[in-house]
């Protein structure tokens, strides 16, 4: 079996998200990772323009999606997973089993309908730590990497590439915030160290990039480069230094612009909230709840 993947990245620029297609060229099977449903907050409209780019590429290259993967319950964009599942009904939607914790937390915050399940059943598959699965002939290992959220997982194609979601970012950007409910800087440190123990030649694919002005947007680096120069987590940084930096920095951050709409859609695996008796679906906004 081959274990070299072809990766195509489709940036969604509003949320700086790197939608990805992970391809096994031997079998033409693929997985879609961290897709986006476009959302315009000032008029409450959704569109599928960026997810449609994935569909067009898959069709043009005659690929067969086996998985629609999430690295976590995103708080900065709406997931395109439900839309894509409608296009590819045989592809399995999947996320880490920690999604159940996020569902339970936000069911209470949003005061959702009593019938909303918090067992992760909106997804076809909940991965456990160290679980294995395949994309065509590619062997993939799930690495539980909580800290940013309890649901975070990374997907590791052995000796080739790892998809880390919102754990670490590009070396000049650093790491993800840990101030969401059930987040933890100490837990994130432990999770990132698991990733950084992988071989130095492994390519690291990040979910977001917020580049400084002197470079363009990009979504991959290597384990070696992260260990050498990631400004938050390079080898010379101690655990105590990281926790202090991350905690102090998080205290200054405002909530992501699309936090409130994103989570209540993404805990449903990208499906919009159920329509009410007038045929309209609504996003709920908890007033005076967030810290800032």
Curated annotation (Swiss-Prot):
Its EC number is 3.-.-.-. Substrate binds at residues 175-181, 208-210, 284-287. Pfam families: Lactamase_B (PF00753). GO terms for cellular component: cytoplasm. Zn(2+) 2 binds at residues 76-77, 166, 208. InterPro entries: Metallo-B-lactamas (IPR001279), Mito_Persulfide_Diox (IPR051682), POD-like_MBL-fold (IPR044528), RibonucZ/Hydroxyglut_hydro (IPR036866). One of its GO terms (molecular function) is hydroxyacylglutathione hydrolase activity. It is an enzyme of class 3 (hydrolase). Binds 2 Zn(2+) ions per subunit. Transmembrane segments: none annotated. GO terms for biological process: glutathione metabolic process; hydrogen sulfide metabolic process; methylglyoxal catabolic process to D-lactate via S-lactoyl-glutathione. Its cofactor is Zn(2+). SMART domains: Lactamase_B. Keywords: Hydrolase, Metal-binding, Zinc. Zn(2+) 1 binds at residues 72, 74, 148, 166. Belongs to the metallo-beta-lactamase superfamily. Glyoxalase II family. PANTHER family: PERSULFIDE DIOXYGENASE ETHE1 (PTHR43084), PERSULFIDE DIOXYGENASE ETHE1, MITOCHONDRIAL (PTHR43084:SF1). This is Glyoxylase B2. The gene is gloB2.
